């Protein structure tokens, strides 16, 4: 896969944050702190003075430079009506439907709840570790809630790095193929307690009134202290009412997390909305051992929280609940069923009303709870506090970043600053520049060469994957391509 196909701005990234109580409180205190550079020797303040807080924990911005603009004057249908039946990765969308982030930065949002990985690494029992890993897998998609803007499709060779010394990890990603679009990422704990890596290439489908992103690619988490590896894929994400009405998102599908050392599995069911919206955002699942004996039950909402309880207590509660439901059902009549059509030109689907909270079963254990979003989130593309900081470009960072880092993309920067005309012009320029570069490689019969990842097979599943080749943080960027 050399990415030598024609350049298109793909509708990718509909694919992939959180406080809790007790032991999770420390994660909340540092949610606004970020460090983006390990090369402290190259960073300095005025007169060459070192910045304060040598541990790299710094307070970053809490708002974007400009508020989000209205999309009310733009019609998705005017574009999509010409493309029914086509591969969505080849549809050029106007910048009005973007959010000011690259898909590589969207992937980085997996790390907002990295404290759950650290917690798993510190736990002595495999069952407890699987609980924390499952909570991390659910939390990794939580930032997508109400995020209806499309991230910018990464250019071939684009990269993004993030170092959070306060959260104990560093992260690097690269766009390794353009068509099909494939984004590879690698993260590791600064204390060498974990490795987290994968490659993402969503399959997109247009269903008339909705766009569905089916995840492709394996996600792998290695807990080095325990010599354990966990693998899974993300649930399917669907954006409804792309033609008419209020946009809303749901995630659905089965996520199977495998512990390749013990044989334990966690099966998580991200439930579809259903006819009356009762199941919207709900997640249910269980952990089983290699003999398929259920060890633990989990339930919650990917937009809110995840709880767990032992199977016996769960079954007892469900039996009592069922008896109560049967008594209530005899007194209720839900009326005629609602028609469910997905034909272009029909009226918009009603946005289902989710139940406000999760009913907590007595004796349950809280595994994860989402962070509150900043009060101005709705004016910032519904970004979380973690997300708001991802594209911030600190003074002097250009000296340590490679020229391919997406913080340096002028179209994303223009949109973030509220200059939509500039952003659109730069987007078109970058697309044309990449087309010309592809043509030049074709003339010279030269294949694209990735810098930081190489194609291979996942060491645990055997599936095709892109593996981190190392050396990025040595910061030799002399042969990086000029893509901007």
Curated annotation (Swiss-Prot):
Molecular function in Gene Ontology: cholesterol binding; cholesterol transfer activity; phosphatidylinositol transfer activity; phosphatidylinositol-4,5-bisphosphate binding
Phosphoserine: residues bearing it: 19-20
Gene Ontology CC annotation, any one: lipid droplet
Name the UniProt record assigns to this protein: Oxysterol-binding protein-related protein 2
Ranges that cross the membrane: none
Summary of the tissues where the protein is detected: Detected in cochlea, in inner and outer hair cells in the organ of Corti (at protein level).
Stated role: Intracellular transport protein that binds sterols and phospholipids and mediates lipid transport between intracellular compartments. Increases plasma membrane cholesterol levels and decreases phosphatidylinositol-4,5-bisphosphate levels in the cell membrane. Binds phosphoinositides, such as phosphatidylinositol-4,5-bisphosphate. Exhibits strong binding to phosphatidic acid and weak binding to phosphatidylinositol 3-phosphate. Binds cholesterol, dehydroergosterol, 22(R)-hydroxycholesterol and 25-hydroxycholesterol (in vitro).
Gene Ontology process terms (BP): intracellular cholesterol transport; plasma membrane organization; protein homotetramerization; regulation of presynaptic cytosolic calcium ion concentration; regulation of synaptic vesicle priming
Subcellular location: Cytoplasm, Cytosol; Lipid droplet; Cell membrane
UniProt: a 1,2-diacyl-sn-glycero-3-phospho-(1D-myo-inositol-4,5-bisphosphate) binding residues: 90, 178-179, 431-435
Gene3D superfamilies: 2.40.160.120, 3.30.70.3490
Keyword ATP-binding: no
Biased composition range(s): Basic and acidic residues: 319-340, 424-450
Family: Belongs to the OSBP family.
Membrane topology according to the record: Peripheral membrane protein
Top-level division of the source organism's lineage: Eukaryota
Keyword annotations from UniProtKB, A to Z: Cell membrane, Cytoplasm, Lipid droplet, Lipid transport, Lipid-binding, Membrane, Phosphoprotein, Transport
């Amino acid at each position: 896969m050399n990415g030598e196909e024609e350049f298109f701005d793909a509708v990718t990234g509909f694919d992939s944050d959180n406080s809790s109580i007790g032991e999770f409180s420390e994660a909340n205190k540092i949610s606004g702190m970020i460090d983006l550079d390990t090369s402290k020797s190259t960073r300095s303040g005025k007169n060459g003075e070192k910045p304060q807080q040598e541990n790299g924990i710094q307070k970053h911005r809490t708002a974007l430079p400009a508020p989000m603009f209205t999309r009310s004057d733009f019609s998705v249908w005017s574009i999509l009506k010409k493309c029914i039946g086509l591969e969505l990765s080849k549809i050029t969308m106007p910048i009005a439907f973007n959010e000011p982030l690259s898909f590589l930065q969207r992937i980085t949002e997996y790390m907002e709840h990295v404290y759950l990985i650290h917690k798993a690494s510190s736990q002595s029992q495999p069952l407890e570790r699987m609980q924390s890993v499952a909570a991390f897998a659910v939390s990794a998609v939580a930032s997508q809630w109400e995020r209806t803007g499309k991230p910018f499709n990464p250019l071939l060779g684009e990269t993004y790095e993030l170092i959070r010394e306060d959260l104990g990890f560093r992260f690097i990603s690269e766009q390794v193929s353009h068509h099909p679009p494939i984004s590879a990422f690698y993260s590791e704990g600064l204390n060498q307690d974990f490795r987290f890596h994968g490659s993402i290439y969503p399959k997109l489908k247009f269903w008339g009134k909705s766009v569905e992103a089916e995840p492709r690619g394996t996600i792998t988490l290695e807990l080095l202290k325990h010599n354990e590896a966990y693998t899974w894929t993300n649930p399917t994400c669907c954006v409804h009412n792309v033609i008419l009405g209020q946009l809303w998102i749901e995630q659905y599908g089965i996520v199977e997390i495998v512990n390749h050392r013990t044989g334990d599995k966690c099966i998580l069911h991200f439930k579809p909305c259903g006819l009356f919206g009762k199941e919207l955002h709900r997640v249910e699942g269980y952990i089983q051992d290699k003999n398929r004996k259920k060890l633990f039950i989990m339930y919650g909402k990917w937009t809110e929280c995840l709880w767990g309880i032992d199977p016996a207590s769960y079954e007892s509660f469900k039996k009592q609940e069922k008896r109560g439901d049967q008594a209530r059902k005899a007194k209720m009549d839900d009326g005629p069923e609602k028609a469910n059509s997905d034909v272009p030109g029909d009226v918009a689907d009603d946005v289902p009303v989710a139940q406000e909270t999760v009913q907590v079963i007595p004796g349950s254990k809280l595994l994860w709870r989402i962070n509150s979003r900043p009060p101005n989130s709705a004016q910032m593309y519904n970004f979380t506090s973690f997300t708001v900081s991802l594209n911030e470009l600190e003074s002097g960072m250009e000296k340590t970043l490679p020229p391919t880092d997406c913080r340096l993309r002028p179209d994303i920067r223009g949109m973030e600053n509220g200059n939509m005309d500039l952003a659109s012009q730069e987007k078109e320029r970058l697309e044309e520049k990449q087309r010309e570069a592809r043509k030049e490689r074709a003339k010279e019969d030269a294949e694209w060469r990735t810098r930081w990842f190489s194609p291979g097979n996942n060491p645990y599943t055997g599936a095709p994957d892109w593996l981190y080749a190392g050396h990025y943080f040595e910061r030799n960027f002399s042969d990086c391509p000029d893509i901007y």
